[in-house]
UniProtKB/Swiss-Prot annotation:
This is Beta sliding clamp. The keyword Nucleotidyltransferase applies. GO terms for molecular function: 3'-5' exonuclease activity; DNA binding; DNA-directed DNA polymerase activity. NCBIfam families: dnan (TIGR00663). It comes from Buchnera aphidicola subsp. Schizaphis graminum (strain Sg).
Amino acid sequence: MKFTIQNDILTKNLKKITRVLVKNISFPILENILIQVEDGTLSLTTTNLEIELISKIEIITKYIPGKTTISGRKILNICRTLSEKSKIKMQLKNKKMYISSENSNYILSTLSADTFPNHQNFDYISKFDISSNILKEMIEKTEFSMGKQDVRYYLNGMLLEKKDKFLRSVATDGYRLAISYTQLKKDINFFSIIIPNKAVMELLKLLNTQPQLLNILIGSNSIRIYTKNLIFTTQLIEGEYPDYKSVLFKEKKNPIITNSILLKKSLLRVAILAHEKFCGIEIKIENGKFKVLSDNQEEETAEDLFEIDYFGEKIEISINVYYLLDVINNIKSENIALFLNKSKSSIQIEAENNSSNAYVVMLLKR
């Protein structure tokens, strides 16, 4: 194997894929990058056995095909120290990788590419195309509600579901729920999968680029996403996701409409003196007044008030202030609508004139 590549191009692609590398004493090849040259393309692959990233780079100079694996951390550190526009030459000889650039030379150990674990064959049950900015927004609108280390392992991820021509992303930690949906241009086979928390966050980083069309394949236990120059594959969480539809309000009556900026500022003011552990605040709405109150373990109190256009039934609820702030930060609307269920056990929040994103937060006992 032999090829030449510009350093800034190689470094850019290495940075994208080395985030998933892990130190593994029992399986050291997981610390390596699979380097493969064939058909005028340089492929760089990393995996932690759950997430796999493949970056593809066109080679415009002469090359000799081949494949091997080298330390991901070492090659990235080498590239970082070299000048951006320098040319890097890499050649595999006698199971060693020879690297040269300008006046610098390196010899790295290799491990056989034959022992590198990767998803070469991917059988899918459903596939579709979607704009990267749409998928990115759906993830951003819901990811904060995912469980982190819940014993109910199926909560430590995001539900991605296609049903009735709609693609939905859903996340819940048992105390709050977030849902976002978009209509697909083409009808595709039904699927309902749970993407692990870490994979969701890694995907979000990869989608932080210029908008492009994504090709997505859904397998029985994994999902694969093709971007312009990168392939993202992750294992899925097995298990049945909770019935999120039973949490969403079937009837939404008497909405409380409030300016999102006014509410956010009010919440931030009283959050200063909220209980450090429970983070609870009280909200009282009556006669066009929206009052927010908090107290803490040191018997300190805070109160803030602003006017709204609501003259219905008096409302008194308690809620986690940071859960509410998370929702407001993800609703890009001048006004938001608050709905209270009959049992007064939860509240549903949406943008005033857009229900494509909805949030349900459990209320605290008063």
